[in-house]
Curated annotation (Swiss-Prot):
Record keywords, A-Z: Ribonucleoprotein, Ribosomal protein
Pfam families per record: Ribosomal_L17
Segments for region (Disordered): 126-194
Domain of life: Bacteria
Organism the protein comes from: Amoebophilus asiaticus (strain 5a2)
Biased amino acid composition, Polar residues: 144-161, 181-194
Keyword Ribosomal protein set for record: yes
Sequence ranges of Basic residues compositional bias: 131-140
Protein family according to the UniProt entry: Belongs to the bacterial ribosomal protein bL17 family.
GO cellular-component term (any): cytosolic large ribosomal subunit
Record note on quaternary structure: Part of the 50S ribosomal subunit. Contacts protein L32.
Protein name: Large ribosomal subunit protein bL17
């Protein structure tokens, strides 16, 4: 009977299972996010979380232990230099499994597994963007720049309508002619062509 045996063998012999989990753990460390089946993701979570906890120690012995799982220097460097300092204060739970639905070919339940502190979608929404607005302040300071935060404010359309002045009968010579045509409205360009 199979009572109390919780370990998922993933229908593979031990060496194949070890290689699979090692390769997926390397991909997770290098790319911060992988797409796999839910069963493999749950097995990978049990495999990779103790490795990340070991990486928080940052000793030579810890590096050698982690290298014994990966057999590759690149994910070990990335884990100790970038990932471990970022998750140093987190007491476990370094990965997140997001279910994506079923795969078309075999109807396997798919998911996206990612490192928790590396969710780029949430970070982009949280960070305010800084944009540069070009201003012109006289002849001496052409192209002076000022930084403006990108807070979304709705401009008053009535003020813009009263401030806008139509461009009529502009006399332009040489290379500036194309720029003047680009700034005019389509109705004004039709009048000039006639």
């Amino acid at each position: 009977m199979r009572h109390g045996k919780k370990f998922n063998h993933l229908s593979r012999p031990a060496s194949h299972r070890k290689a699979l989990l090692s390769n997926q753990a390397k991909s997770l460390i290098l790319h911060k996010r992988i797409i796999t089946t839910v069963a493999k993701a749950k097995a990978l979570r049990k495999f990779v979380e103790p490795i990340i906890t070991k990486a928080k120690q940052d000793s030579t012995h810890a590096r050698r232990v982690v290298f014994s799982y990966f057999q590759d220097k690149e994910p070990v460097k990335l884990l100790f230099n970038e990932v471990a300092p970022k998750i140093g204060d987190r007491p476990g739970g370094y990965t997140r499994i997001i279910r994506l639905g079923n795969r078309l070919g075999d109807n396997a339940e798919m998911c996206m597994m990612e490192l928790v502190d590396y969710n780029t979608y949430l970070q982009k929404a949280a960070e305010p963007k800084q944009t540069k607005a070009r201003t012109r302040r006289g002849k001496g300071k052409l192209g002076a720049t000022t930084t403006v935060s990108s807070e979304k404010t709705q401009p008053n359309t009535q003020d813009m309508a009263t401030q806008a002045k139509p461009v009529e009968n502009t006399q332009v010579e040489g290379a500036d002619e194309q720029e003047a045509l680009d700034t005019q409205s389509p109705e004004q360009t039709n009048k000039q062509e006639e």
